[in-house]
Amino acid sequence: MVSRRVQALLDQLRAQGIQDEQVLNALAAVPREKFVDEAFEQKAWDNIALPIGQGQTISQPYMVARMTELLELTPQSRVLETGTGSGYQTAILAHLVQHVCSVERIKGLQWQARRRLKNLDLHNVSTRHGDGWQGWQARAPFDAIIVTAAPPEIPTALMTQLDEGGILVLPVGEEHQYLKRVRRRGGEFIIDTVEAVRFVPLVKGELA
């Protein structure tokens, strides 16, 4: 039985077009208030992005659900997340697949996310302090890659780390950003534009 606030959010997400019940169940199972500062706990189940420090944000629940749905995950999917951030999106993925690899360039955020995931008994996640533009070549190929910050163009390294039939979902752009879905078909990459979005930039190379 979910709380009234959680149910209200799920109803809102359905009204916004989220159809995958597995994704909605994962959102209901992950306590979003555990991934925000105490000052924002009362807003944790509002359908808005919230600051998490270091110039980063925890994404709006609609966008978390939309991007996760676009990945077309199965329990066996090998998943890479670029931009661990608070660990909230990571936790959603961990409820849906057997294992998640996640890269974060800001060491402090990586440590906090690892602690939160451990406290929720989510042990099927590997995190790494690194440059998200480069993905995680040692763990490739991946069936699904999700990027939670916006590069100005699609990073080549991430496309090449997709397995055959794999899907990459990410925001792309600077002043004007669009959510893109990239599907690998043999030597080709089929790119679809989904909708206009607004994300923090994906910083290249610079670790913090």
Swiss-Prot record:
An annotated GO BP:
methylation
Q: By its UniProt entry, which CDD domains does this protein fall under? A: AdoMet_MTases
Chief place where the protein resides: cytoplasm
A GO cellular component annotation here is: cytoplasm
* Domain of life of the organism encoding this protein: Bacteria
Sorted keywords for this record are: Cytoplasm, Methyltransferase, S-adenosyl-L-methionine, Transferase
Q: What class of enzyme is it?
A: transferase
Q: Quote the EC number.
A: 2.1.1.77
Which Pfam families does the UniProt record give? PCMT
Q: What is this protein called?
A: Protein-L-isoaspartate O-methyltransferase
Q: What is the lineage of its organism?
A: Bacteria, Pseudomonadati, Pseudomonadota, Gammaproteobacteria, Enterobacterales
